[in-house]
């Protein structure tokens, strides 16, 4: 509840006032719903009677929203008073499909949490600037690969054009997948460093777990198969394998055998889902308006 109260209160102080709040309660075990109903009666609540995963939960919220733009916001965040106002400024270009903010560590506000999401051409997704001291190095407005769905704004119509978050992902990398699909279709992601929120990273999911590791490994295979240009996929496949072997060796030697086994399990789950990923690829590639060179250039 402490996370929700902080988040709600920061939204109530926004300089931009024309918005609705939707709480998607993904079968929480605390009194989040009762707390919200009692203290914030204007908030719309979507109750899910089982843990459907992040992707399905936010899809449900998007579908019942009514605004032109949709902000996805984790409950463990606090937004500066002009956050919504600054996020909306990012849509001045008609080709902008999403806006990324500058996320700061809630507990140490001199530390960057996320300054936009990227994916390495031959490696894995990463949060730009995560853990860095905030000395102004991420204060430049620019177009980037994608936004972290923990605090990202999207044109709502895009979900109806390109599809919603992939519910087969359950959680992790579904935002990377969506960013990729938007880039393929010619929609840009605008990073506005003046839109600032504070994030208690891991406050509701804890740290590295076997389940998280399994999902990340499984979903990364799907992200690549669905979105990479075909020749890029072929060219980079050997490097993908080398990077995974190094990663799994690190799990085995520096973490635990259970984490290693979770990673391997996720990898093989991803392989088993190849036919499904390739079917999705056909749909995604039909919307492609950019070149392979463009896509390779935005992968850092």
Stretches with model-predicted labels:
Residues 7, 48-65, 75, 86:
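Glycine-rich, basic loop-to-helix element that forms the pyrophosphate-binding segment
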Residues 9-18:
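Short, acidic, metal-binding catalytic loop of nucleotide-sugar glycosyltransferases
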Residues 10, 25-34, 50:
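A conserved acidic beta->alpha catalytic loop
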Residues 70:
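Short aromatic/hydrophobic "clamp" motif used to bind/position activated sugar donors
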Residues 77-120:
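Conserved donor NDP-sugar-binding/catalytic core segment of glycosyltransferases
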Residues 111-114, 121-126, 132-157, 176, ...:
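A recurrent flexible, glycine/aromatic-enriched loop bordering the glycosyltransferase active site
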Residues 145-196:
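A short, conserved alpha-helix in the catalytic core of glycosyltransferases
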Residues 185, 189-279, 292:
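Active-site-adjacent helix/loop segment of glycosyltransferases
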């Amino acid at each position: 509840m402490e996370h929700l109260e902080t988040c709600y209160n920061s939204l109530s102080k926004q300089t931009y006032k024309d918005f609705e709040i939707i709480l998607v309660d993904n079968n929480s075990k605390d009194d989040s719903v009762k707390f919200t109903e009692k203290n914030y009666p204007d908030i719309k609540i979507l109750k899910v009677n089982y843990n459907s995963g992040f992707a399905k939960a936010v899809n449900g919220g998007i579908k019942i929203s009514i605004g032109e733009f949709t902000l996805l916001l984790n409950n463990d965040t606090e937004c500066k008073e002009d956050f919504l106002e600054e996020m909306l400024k990012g849509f001045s270009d008609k080709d902008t499909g999403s806006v990324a903010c500058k996320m700061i560590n809630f507990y140490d506000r001199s530390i960057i949490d996320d300054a936009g999401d990227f994916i390495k051409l031959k490696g894995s997704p990463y949060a730009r600037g995560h853990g860095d001291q905030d000395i102004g190095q991420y204060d430049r407005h620019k177009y980037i690969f994608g936004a972290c769905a923990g605090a990202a704004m999207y044109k709502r119509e895009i979900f109806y054009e390109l599809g919603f978050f992939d519910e087969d992902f359950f959680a992790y990398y579904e935002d990377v997948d969506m960013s990729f699909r938007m880039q393929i279709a010619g929609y840009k992601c605008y990073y506005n460093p003046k839109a600032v929120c504070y994030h208690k990273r891991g406050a509701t999911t804890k740290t590295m777990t076997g389940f998280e590791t399994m999902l990340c490994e499984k979903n990364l295979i799907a992200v690549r198969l669905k979105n990479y240009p075909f020749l890029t996929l072929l060219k980079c496949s050997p490097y993908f394998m080398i990077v995974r072997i190094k990663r799994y060796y690190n799990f085995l030697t520096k973490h635990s055998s259970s984490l290693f086994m979770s990673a391997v399990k996720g990898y093989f789950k991803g392989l088993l889902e190849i036919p499904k990923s390739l079917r999705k690829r056909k749909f995604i590639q039909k919307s492609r308006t950019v070149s392979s060179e463009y896509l390779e250039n935005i992968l850092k």
